[in-house]
From Swiss-Prot:
Residues 1-101 are annotated as: Disordered. It comes from Dhori virus (strain Indian/1313/61). This is Putative uncharacterized protein M2. Residues 27-70 have a biased composition (Basic and acidic residues).
């Protein structure tokens, strides 16, 4: 800190006092837009596991999922007083995870397909090429 005194230790840890850029980590601002949940500081976005809550999302929202929009099956603005805002709609299948954002149709497309060994791919090169292509397509598990 050339030329400026370090901040006084008022209500913050020593570490935070030494680094004036750090702020209390869990700040989330609910800006009134639909489903738009902004981290209060850019530093928060670097914490992948910080769980945040917001009046638009009933439960905790992982910071990394914020840009993906609401969890599947969440009603953002149902009709009704603003208190009821984060009601959950019926989740299509309770067996699937809450945060599965992959649409079901796309999931079916990603199901396991065996790598076909064609008669002309008896040499190693073609085998490896087949496997590599299927890996790139995401069809190989």
């Amino acid at each position: 800190f050339r030329g400026r005194a370090p901040r006084p230790l008022v209500g913050r840890s020593c570490q935070a006092a030494q680094h004036p850029h750090t702020r209390p980590k869990r700040q989330v601002r609910d800006c009134g837009r639909e489903g738009d949940l902004r981290a209060g500081k850019a530093a928060d976005r670097r914490l992948p596991r910080a769980r945040e809550t917001c009046s638009r999302f009933g439960e905790g929202v992982r910071q990394k999922d914020v840009h993906k929009g609401p969890v599947e099956g969440t009603v953002l603005n149902p009709a009704g007083p603003p208190g009821d805002q984060a009601q959950r709609a019926d989740v299509p299948d309770p067996g699937r995870s809450r945060r599965a954002t992959v649409p079901i149709a796309q999931e079916r497309r990603l199901e396991h397909r065996p790598i076909l060994v064609y008669p002309e791919s008896d040499n190693m090169y073609n085998l490896i090429r087949e496997a590599w292509l299927s890996l790139e397509r995401g069809t190989h598990r």
